[in-house]
Amino acid sequence: MEPGNATVSIEEAKLLQSSLQTAYGSTPAENPAIYRDLSPFSLDERFGNNEQWLKDVAVRTYHDIDVNWRIKERGQSVFYRNYVPSSELINRLQKMGNERAEFMQTYQTGYRLNGQRHPHSWSIIDAEECVQWILGVWER
């Protein structure tokens, strides 16, 4: 895990490790087998191919990809960002024939209600379009 050099990134990494330790009694580094079984996907193909269970499921991942903001504000490169494995997940699903697997990329759309820039904000999703997509999936 690369937390970066920003305080918010370090605190986020600590919170995640603590949550995993509490929930599963170990971290992924300490007991990778638990996380292999729990994870729907891993970049490391040695940890199974759990994405196979999603090959017939409509899947979307949404990401506000602003590399310069990440570097400047969080001290983080793209290497450890969640859009890297998400894009590989979508790629693998499409290679399996899943035409309903989509990587939804936005740029500089993530803002909290108070105006604070944050790439994990719900504002990265076009709500109306997403609802229409969900309804289309249900009707299928």
Protein language model regions, located:
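Mobile cap/lid helix-loop segments that gate and shape the active-site cleft of serine hydrolases
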Residues: P3-Q52
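C-terminal catalytic histidine-bearing segment of alpha/beta-hydrolase fold enzymes
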Residues: V59-R140
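A general structural motif
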Residues: L54-A58
